[in-house]
Regions:
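N-terminal cofactor/phosphate-binding cores enriched in small/glycine residues
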Residues: 27, 33-64
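Mature extracytoplasmic enzyme cores
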Residues: 1-16, 24, 41-50, 68-229
């Protein structure tokens, strides 16, 4: 169990009437501006006055301090120490915004760790009649994996298909299966999302993010810091 008191057989009346931090709300605390120690500690005091048991330090759009920098990590430590002094819980959050995996783009600076997807298209190159901008679209730099001869019946349903060579002529429509690397995005600070099917990519994410949090606050793991969200 995450909280040790959950293993107790009975809930005491005293604990029910005045629950400790484990049994109180812990809101997502949006970090979306320039962060300073004094202001962060002031807000933690307000959380405590409101009856919250802790908080999740959640990076959101607008953060001005450099994510995972020494300055940023010191602020994390300051908040953990403040939570401890207030008898509260400080939950960590492992990403710059969401979803977790790219570490704010630090993981995917290395293109080997960038997300990949399968593109199935009747166009060998991007010569479609209509251009549509999508996040997982055509790059013309994809790796051709296979070609297929796809035959549809008069109602547009699949009649047959078979794999053929790149230079073979198709009886129906020739379709191409490409492995593409996802394009860069401002959401990932000019990088991309990570290839979460790659163990090496996930290991790199853990190294950059979780290990850094462990170095900074590991002495409070399973104490003031119950988990990383």
């Amino acid at each position: 169990m995450l909280y040790k008191k959950n293993s107790e057989e009975k809930l005491s009346n005293e604990l029910f009437k005045n629950p400790t931090c484990e049994f109180r709300g812990t809101p997502f605390w949006a970090w979306n501006s320039w962060l300073e120690k004094d202001e962060l500690e002031r807000q933690i005091e307000i959380f405590n006055e409101m009856g919250f048991g802790g908080f999740h330090m959640h990076v959101r759009t607008g953060l001005k301090n450099k994510y995972l920098s020494d300055e940023y990590m010191q602020l994390i430590r300051d908040c953990v120490d403040k939570a401890k002094s207030e008898k509260m819980l400080a939950w960590l959050y492992d990403e710059d915004r969401w979803p977790s995996g790219a570490a704010g783009g630090y993981v995917t600076e290395d293109e080997r760790y960038r997300a990949r997807y399968l593109l199935f298209t009747p166009f060998k190159t991007a010569e479609a009649k209509k251009s549509v901008e999508v996040s997982a679209g055509r790059t013309n730099n994809g790796k051709l994996l296979a070609c297929y001869d796809v035959v549809l019946d008069k109602d547009g349903y699949l009649s047959s298909y078979k794999q053929i060579g790149e230079d073979d002529k198709a009886e129906g429509t020739k379709w191409y299966a490409f492995m593409e690397i996802i394009g860069e995005s401002d959401w990932f600070n000019g990088k991309t999302y990570a290839d979460t099917l790659s163990k090496d990519a996930v290991d790199r994410f853990v190294e950059i993010t979780h290990e850094k949090y462990k170095k900074c606050t590991g002495d409070e793991f399973d104490k003031t810091v119950p988990a990383i969200f």
